[in-house]
Amino acid sequence: MTSVSYRPEPGSIPTDPGVYTFRDAHERVIYVGKAKNLRARLSNYFQDLDQLHPRTRAMVQSANHVQWTVVSSELEALNLEYTWIKRFNPRFNVMYRDDKTYPMLAISVKEQIPRAFMYRGPRRKGVRYFGPYPKAWAIRETLESLTRVFPIRTCSAGVYRRHEALGRPCLLGYIDRCSAPCVGKITPEDHRALVDQFSSFLAGNTEPVLRRVRKEMEQASENLDFERAASLRDQLQAMQKSMERQAVVFSDNTDADLIAFVADELEAAVQIFHVRGGRIHGQRGWVVEREDLSEEKLVADFITQFYGETAELAKATETQVGGASGPEVDRDLARAINPAAAQDLGDLVGDVQVTPVPREILVHAMPDDADDLAAWLTSLRGSNMQIRVPQRGDKKALMTTAETNATQALAQHKLKRAGDITARSAALKELQEALWMDESPLRIECTDISHIQGTDVVASLVVFEDGLPKKADYRRYKIRDAAGDGHSDDVASIAEVVRRRFKRYQQDKSAVPAGDDAGDLLEGETELEDNSAEGTDPATEKRKFAYPPQLFIVDGGLPQVNAAQEVLDELGVNDVTLVGIAKRLEEIWVPGEEYPIIVPRNSPALYLVQNLRDEAHRFAITFHRQQRSARMRRSKLDDIPGLGPKRRKQLVKEFGSVARVKEASVEDIAALPGFGPKLAQLIHDALNAE
């Protein structure tokens, strides 16, 4: 019989409800769970390891110790479990990730003149989403039909500005498919009202619009205004055509989500059909590795994760688009939303102002703790909802369809994954053998430097886990000490990046707050140095950068590799394999070795290393271009304290250029609206200082 050494004494575990966490040697949370009875639940993990499910066994063996928190009720445990899963993103908890990015119809409500457009990717604040749609052409046809009725803007910002400057609309404006706000044919307020009607129609509130158009058509016909009656008839047909694309499954105004699971011993597939107003508005699917859980527990975990995520996204977006007088975005809430999960779980049916929890959730198996779950969902929805298992009729038939979809999705996933896993495993195994490593490098990091003649020197750090990019862990650095006049020391730059990366690791490992040497940025986050954003949650930051790779790759040859190794020796890091890849001959260099390792050109291992190097290069160049563009846009006005963007723009618009502002007198500047003598003197002195 085999067991683990950190098993707590059974008598020390309380019998109360609570939440427990398994943590590894780096204090990283790798699993979060809840229980009605902590002692009974935790005892299941410490039986003979050979009797555990493979995934559970791997988790227990990866852990270093277990902790628990007692709460007063099962509902409180449910809330705390969800919060901690969002906070720590444990790798052994099931995360529902979609196998593709479905296109959505998006409306940029944050813009002064909102526009409708097709969109793929993670959800953004200030944008309302409809869908997902199975095909992009379905969105294009929907827009083509509905812009006849709701002629809202669909052009990009560049096209809008161009026609605004020209003073004449585009073709869509001439054929009445756009109300042409760019040339003032409609006021911003009236255009926004039109956008609201368009959004309401897409969200399923179709009857009021249809009644209004039908009444106006009849009135126009009675007034013998046959041209307008014909136009309204065409609008009515366009709306009906758009509605026909959404299959009618129920005769009543059913507002429900149907959730179907199909699982084998290792994996589970889930399909969700979103029904609004009796019509299927969207369909999504996920395939995940299965925990050693019952079907009822799987359903409960999915509902908790999916609806908790969508409710947070809706709340954050509503706060963002609440208007000029509304509150600012809750920073802690926004930071709690995982970007990857936001992409996979946040695609709601309808817009973000429609509650993400429907009146009814239909499942094929009643989830565990259904009453507590329903109470939690009711609090998210703001009104009563129920969870049911359909027994007969149309709802049962649609559940069967959803189960069929889940079965097919699981079969397709297994076929695809068999090939992918085989290739990645072969590459990692070959890399292990080529570099004489004790184990396969499941986490690999790679860094690259980017600059132009020593200016705007930046670096990137990309992360692959299990042979796949983990973009949530990407970093980018502004190099501080390695740049000179017209040149850059790449060797010193590499050394700086390695020092900052592993010094941060040591600080996290010893639970010391990150200092000035830990200045890194996540891809997609605000470009602030040193992670010093106001309100940063130390626990969240620790999760992002808290454990070392098995393999660290630098883009360069022997000088870069030796410099990186000196830094690792200086910091006492001896559990990381370090190599470099030279661009010219694709040679792999090892510290202290006179000759490189030659890996066959057709080797999966070399392909993986090249993929890492190319991704690091792409990420570094992207950041370098951003920095260079920002520098080129800067002027002396940017450095004047108390002079904001609006006033800078006003100065350049009034005087024509920064040079002419410099030539202007204090009196000329002070004469501008909003500029007093004191500010005018400050601007004049700053621009004319030697």
UniProtKB/Swiss-Prot annotation:
Pfam families: GIY-YIG, HHH_5, UVR, UvrC_RNaseH, UvrC_RNaseH_dom
Main subcellular localisation: cytoplasm
CDD domains associated with the record: GIY-YIG_UvrC_Cho (cd10434)
This protein's name: UvrABC system protein C
HAMAP family according to UniProt: UvrC
Physiological role: The UvrABC repair system catalyzes the recognition and processing of DNA lesions. UvrC both incises the 5' and 3' sides of the lesion. The N-terminal half is responsible for the 3' incision and the C-terminal half is responsible for the 5' incision.
UniProt family annotation: Belongs to the UvrC family.
